[in-house]
Amino acid sequence: TRRLASVIEALDPDVVALQELDSAMSDRRRRDLLKQISEFTGLDYQHFFGGLAPINGGKVGPGLLFKKDLEVVKKKIIPLAGDEARSAVRVDFEKFTFMGTHLDLNNAKRTQSASTLVNETDFIHKPCFLAGDLNDSHRWGNGGIAFPVLADKFSIVSDTEGNTIPGRTDNGALIDYILFKDYKNSGIKIVETHIVRTLKVNGSVIDLGSISDHYPVYVDIEIPGLSGIENASRSNSIRIYPTQVQNTLNIQSESPVRKINIYSMTGQKQLETNNPGTASIDISSLSNGIYIVEIFADNGTAFKGKIIKR
């Protein structure tokens, strides 16, 4: 639980879809796993659990974490078909809706669930994201079994290079997705997306296959009127600006800056500067995308945050 939370903390997403969460099971001390994960991240999350499958006096199913500064308009649990009780969790925010799910292994019931989710969007009058383990793939024959039903309304916006199941090298193990259905040309833009296989966590780059049997998938989006970057780990004496950068990142620090590291979102170091002796750093050599910036000052203070390179 703590290791998974550390991955979420490192990625620092605004919304997280999780599956196979347990709540109130008698053999697990009646824990609320989603709440535990939320607390262990150390980030300012709300949580919404929607499991309907009964097990050992509790329930198992999907859930969402979302930052407390996102205004929630509505929350809903959507029952879905399955050999076990399946569901989707839906949260309507001010500017978009987000649904998380884990579809069934039964082909017919998975297809039925896909129809339920597609029909749900007919009553959602804003842009809508659907994320989770779909147990289906657009790579399968005929574009998948249930996937063509989803594709009637949704588009794939998440990374489709390689697989989301660690250790699988065949063409059929991409089953975790983030899908998007626009509404009235919302202007929402996809900035960057990755299947995250390695990540810098607590100072070390780790293989995320050692933490979960599915790799996390993330999409960074830009919503008109909302900032795409909220830096959660910051020092009062160090700040960076702007957070959406073209060539030059400016640094303001009360103490001389000793070291600057810039990492890709998947943990690879892209740039390192020691004793820069300047209030700015040239990042024009970096490709466009999302980066993590670490800054260390002589007085021992440190900063960690994100930037968008354009």
Residue ranges and their predicted role:
Residues E230-R310:
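C-terminal outer-membrane/trafficking sorting elements
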Residues I77-P79, M99-N107:
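Surface-exposed cleft-lining segments at the edges of enzyme active sites
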Residues K76-I77, T121-F129, D136-L226:
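Metal-dependent phosphoester-hydrolase catalytic domains
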Residues T1-L4, A17, R30-L33, I37, ...:
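Stable alpha-helical elements in mature extracytoplasmic
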Residues V15, L21-F96, V191-I195:
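Structured beta-strand-rich core segments of catalytic domains in phosphoester-bond hydrolases
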Residues A17-Q19, F48-G51, F129-D133, I156-T160:
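Active-site neighborhood of phospho(di)ester-bond hydrolases with catalytic His/Asp-centered motifs
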Residues L4-R30, F98-T101, L117-N142, L179, ...:
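Active-site beta-strand/loop signature of hydrolases that rely on acidic residues for catalysis
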Residues K68-D69, Y183, G225, T266-Q268, ...:
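Solvent-exposed strand-loop boundary residues in beta-sheet-rich modules
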